[in-house]
Amino acid sequence: MKRTYQPSKTRRARTHGFLVRMKTRGGRAVIAARRAKGRARLAV
């Protein structure tokens, strides 16, 4: 059985990237929360 995590930069960015987050209201909330917390990386 192969492992479940098969890294891909493209897929990672397309599902968890900044632009994807900004598309939905919930995603923007995530970015806002991470900004408020002072995260160095807001999204991938």
From Swiss-Prot:
Which cysteine pairs are joined by S-S bonds? none
Superkingdom of origin organism:
Bacteria
Q: Which residues form a coiled coil?
A: none
**One GO cellular component term:** ribonucleoprotein complex
The molecular function terms in GO held by this entry are:
structural constituent of ribosome
Q: Name one Pfam family in it.
A: Ribosomal_L34
GO terms (BP aspect): translation
Which keywords label this protein? Ribonucleoprotein, Ribosomal protein
Q: Which NCBIfam families does this one have? A: rpmH_bact (TIGR01030)
The text of the family note is:
Belongs to the bacterial ribosomal protein bL34 family.
Q: What is this protein called?
A: Large ribosomal subunit protein bL34
